[in-house]
Amino acid sequence: MDRGELSRVFQMFDKNGDGKIAKNELKDFFKSVGIMVPENEINEMIAKMDVNGDGAMDIDEFGSLYQEMVEEKEEEEDMREAFRVFDQNGDGFITDEELRSVLASMGLKQGRTLEDCKKMISKVDVDGDGMVNFKEFKQMMRGGGFAALSSN
């Protein structure tokens, strides 16, 4: 990310133009784009990035937060893309049949049988519906993916 882009984004947050993003400016910005962030999370963001301890973020401190946000967005997009590969019918869920089909097409030993796939899904199926939704998929991928589930 170049300095010009960072500066433009920073100015969108820095409403009073004092060169710092205060807690209320951060909160107001998120609110203006329809994202409700709890007060404690706003405080955590500022505390984490506020290197000089003045209770606000200057452009350099903001740069770290912005980079983190961009990386999280990219990770989310990658996860959605991977989820779409497994969710073959596009209904928002990965079934045992879809899992078996994708794992077989990848030439993986894991999940050769429907029963294996059901077991793998049951390890991440938080809501107990027998399928993996996107939220469950993200948790699973952060834990090593479907391959990690087949080991026990």
UniProtKB/Swiss-Prot annotation:
Entry binding sites for Ca(2+) 2: 50, 52, 54, 61
UniProt-listed GO biological process terms: double fertilization forming a zygote and endosperm
Binding site for Ca(2+) 1: 14, 16, 18, 20, 25
Keywords: Calcium, Metal-binding, Repeat
Record PROSITE patterns: EF_HAND_1, EF_HAND_2
Binding-site list for Ca(2+) 4: 125, 127, 129, 131, 136
Residues annotated as domain EF-hand: 1-36, 37-72, 74-109, 112-147
Residues binding Ca(2+) 3: 87, 89, 91, 98
Coiled-coil stretches: none
GO molecular function: calcium ion binding
Entry GO terms, CC: cytoplasm
Family, per entry: Belongs to the calmodulin family.
Primary role: Potential calcium sensor that is required for pollen tube attraction for ovule fertilization.
Protein name: Calmodulin-like protein 2
Provenance organism: Arabidopsis thaliana (Mouse-ear cress)
